[in-house]
Structures are given as structure tokens and as C-alpha cells.
Amino acid sequence: MNPNQKIIAIGSICMVIGIVSLMLQIGNMISIWISHSIQTGNQRQAEPISNTKVLNEKAVASVTLAGNSSLCPISGWAVHSKDNSIRIGSKGDVFVIREPFISCSHLECRTFFLTQGALLNDKHSNGTVKDRSPHRTLMSCPVGEAPSPYNSRFESVAWSASACHDGTSWLTIGISGPDNGAVAVLKYNGIITDTIKSWRNNILRTQESECACVNGSCFTVMTDGPSNGQASYKIFKMEKGKVVKSVELDAPNYHYEECSCYPDAGEITCVCRDNWHGSNRPWVSFNQNLEYQIGYICSGVFGDNPRPNDGTGSCGPVSPNGAYGVKGFSFKYGNGVWIGRTKSTNSRSGFEMIWDPNGWTGTDSSFSVKQDIVAITDWSGYSGSFVQHPELTGLDCIRPCFWVELIRGRPKESTIWTSGSSISFCGVDSDTVGWSWPDGAELPFTIDK
């Protein structure tokens, strides 16, 4: 075969290979096009179903949390959540926080918390024992999850806060600013809707737990004035994030701070902290027109910390060990009361739930049920109430729940920071168990050494 014939033969072979390759590519493209057409057709057929589902979800997304039901009858408390945020924060990106609380809509429960603008085990966690700073913000994450930059959403700039859901949107209340002129910023669905200026210019502050909603209106209690003497206390009624009514309590010799409020049969009951002179807890109950009654829990099973040993109670402030205090809660059932309190009488350690069947009105110290929550050898802290509405649970009553803050770090431990994790429980009329669910983190961290 001469050179020209070789060239022609090689060229012919290359052309055949090229034609075959082109045909294969064309076949592949046709196959992909057919497959895509089938998938697109299937998606188009499914679209009406998908749209119907979305429309249905939107149709049930907005309700009114009536709050007209009574509290559910309960015999004990079932563990609901534990976030383990300090343990996780030794290696993970977890916020330095205090004052966590829980609130539920008709669709979900969320943990709200006041950050310090810092992460655990980081240099900016230094000095976070301070309560009020311009770096503090209210944020929230799904209940039971450790609060981190990856699962949390910003709510408000705040060093004192509250939040609740009326069935349509979240209402948040965030207080920030100087001690002598702080302002509460109200947001509804994330949009600023109103503000409340400090009226006594002495550390305006609010609940550090959820506000309470009834029939589309939400209610909160605020304090302005001395932490160790007579102060001023106001109830605010809000609709879609705007204040529509307020009333100042006529409460001489009473001291209300950090109230834990809940709806019950269309009215609101708040159990608060007396930081002035009471080792039992003051309460205020009111209807939707803000007509109110006030008192102290009469039981000889005292609920504050510090406090004296249980003894004879009073329907006014019990003065022994009455100064200072800690945020707490109770649930009223007729003349009876579930009291949540630290186990220790003089430090924020341990936690227990006690049922006093006559404690709302009676002054003796007898009780019939005690359920352990945290051992006295482990740190606790603030505690507060929240509820789950029938629109969430499907029950015909309002389920009472509570959370406990488990404070770690300064001032009791050798760290540069102060933070906490949280646990929560809900009332049930079935089997429960007492145990200890402590924070469980091993300190100090690397940053502390």
C-alpha cells in the first residue's frame, strides 16, 4: 500500500469513528431529553397537590390562642427538654447566655435567651457576669437545642425581655438602654410596633419569661424603681404588638419583679419575685380589662431563695431572709398550689416541685407531693412558667410547664464567664419520676486556664 492509500485508509477510519461517536452523543442527548420530559411531566402533575398542601398549611397557620380553658389536672411533671449547651459549648460554637425561657405557639416551642454577644470558650466571654450591657440581645432557637449562631434567630436588642405568640405572630419585648432611661421595644412579626419608656428612670425591667395571650391580646408586667424597696409596677395589654391599655398596680408594701405569667380560664395569673422583703412569692391576677387582685402565696412552704426553713406562712410578705431573691413560679389550682423552688435555702442549687393542696390560702407547711428535679449538689438558677395551648396539644385544657436555668461559671466557679443551660418539664396526669437532671459540664474550660 503506497503512502497515499495509507492516508486515505486512516482518514476513512477516523471519519467512521467520528460518525459513530456523533451518533452516540446524539442518542445520549435524546435519552436525556426524554428522561427530563418525563420528570418534568411528573412534577407538573404533582404541582397542584403541592400547592394544595401549601395552601392548607397557610389556612391553619393563623389561629387565635383563646386561653379560655382551665389548666390541665396533673399529678406530676414529665421531662420535656434539656439543651446541654455548656457541655456542647466546650468544643462547639455556643452562645454565652443567661435568662433563658420557653414559649410555645400553636405550632412549636422555642427557647428564648439573652446572649452576651459572645461564644463559650472565647475571649469575649470574659466578664459576662454583668447583667446589663449594650451587647446583650434576645435570640431564640428550637426548644432542646444548644443556642448557637447556626440555629438561632435574632429577636431584639435587650438586657431584659419577654416573648409570646398570639396564634398569628410572635410578640417580643426587648428592654435596652441606660439604667436611668431604658426603653422597651415591642416587635410583632419582627417589625417594631411600639415602645415603652422608663417611667421612673430606675432600671425598667420585665419578666424574663413568656408573656401571656388570651383571645388575641397579650399581657405583660413591668417594674421600674428600686430593687430593695417600694417600686412601681404596671400591667400592659397589647394587641398586634401595640399597647392598647395599661394600669399601675396600687400595691404598697408589695414588691414585684420578674413575674411568671400564664393564662387560666380566660384570666392571667402572675407569680413573681419579691427582692425587697419577702421569702414567699407575691402574685397578681387580672382579667382582660386589667381589673386585678394582689396577694402573696400563703403557704408555709416558702418558694423564694434565700428563705427560712419551712414553717408558718403568711398571706403577706414573710420577712425572715426576705431580702434579695430569685425568679421563680407557681401554678394555682383552687386553694392548692404547685410550688417550684431551689432545694437549698441560701444558694441557687437544686430544684424541686412541691404540691401543697391548701397552700394558696393556707399558712401551714404540710404538702402531699415532692418531685426532685435537680440535686442540691448541682447548680440551678432562675425558673419560670410556660404553657402549651390546646391548639398545640389537642387537649381540651391548658398544659402547665416550667423551665429551670442551670447557671455555670462566675461568681461561684473559677471561670472568666457566666452562662447557663436549661431543662424543662410539663405537667401530666400519668406516671412521672423524680431524679436529678444537672447541667453536667466539667469546668474550667481551656479559656479559663
Curated annotation (Swiss-Prot):
Written domain comment of the UniProt record: Intact N-terminus is essential for virion morphogenesis. Possesses two apical sorting signals, one in the ectodomain, which is likely to be a glycan, and the other in the transmembrane domain. The transmembrane domain also plays a role in lipid raft association.
Organism for this UniProt entry: Influenza A virus (strain A/Chicken/Shantou/4231/2003 H5N1 genotype V)
Name the UniProt record assigns to this protein: Neuraminidase
Single biological process term from Gene Ontology: viral budding from plasma membrane
Note: The influenza A genome consist of 8 RNA segments. Genetic variation of hemagglutinin and/or neuraminidase genes results in the emergence of new influenza strains. The mechanism of variation can be the result of point mutations or the result of genetic reassortment between segments of two different strains.
Enzyme Commission code(s) on record: 3.2.1.18
Activity regulation text: Inhibited by the neuraminidase inhibitors zanamivir (Relenza) and oseltamivir (Tamiflu). These drugs interfere with the release of progeny virus from infected cells and are effective against all influenza strains. Resistance to neuraminidase inhibitors is quite rare.
Cofactor(s) the protein requires to work: Ca(2+)
Positions with a binding annotation for Ca(2+): D274, G278, D304
Region described as Involved in apical transport and lipid raft association: spans on this chain: 11-33
Matching HAMAP family: INFV_NRAM (MF_04071)
Gene3D superfamilies: 2.120.10.10
